[in-house]
Regions:
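Helix-loop-strand module that forms the ligand-binding subsite of alpha/beta enzymes
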Residues: 1-62
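Glycine-rich phosphate/pyrophosphate-binding loop and the adjoining helix
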Residues: 49, 53, 57-97
Length: 97
């Protein structure tokens, strides 16, 4: 997912809101596996905190197992991701599921 203005994109926030209804409704959704794959334009990794922290906390609330994270900074233009090991990291993370 892209990082927009140091936060989660609205589409992902909508998913979190809908999943939260299961929690407050008492539905047992524990034990799922999840991961974070995100990129941003800036070079500083702390820019990812606005995405990483809410997703980690949401996973903890739902009692999901965070399998891993791939956070790739410095990705602005088309093709920039190819200059990183982000795709290889994402492929390795996918193997954990």
């Amino acid at each position: 997912m892209p990082v927009y203005w140091y936060s989660i994109p609205a589409q992902i926030k909508g998913v979190i809101d809908r999943m939260f209804s299961f929690v407050v409704g008492g539905k047992n959704i524990a034990g799922k596996e999840c991961a974070i794959i995100a990129c941003c334009e800036e070079a500083e990794m702390d820019v990812m905190d606005g995405v990483r922290i809410p997703l980690e906390r949401s996973a903890a609330l739902m009692k999901w197992d965070m399998v891993g994270e791939v956070l790739v900074p410095g990705v602005l233009n088309a093709g920039d991701i190819a200059k990183t090991d982000g795709c290889a990291q994402a492929a390795a993370l996918a193997e954990k599921f």
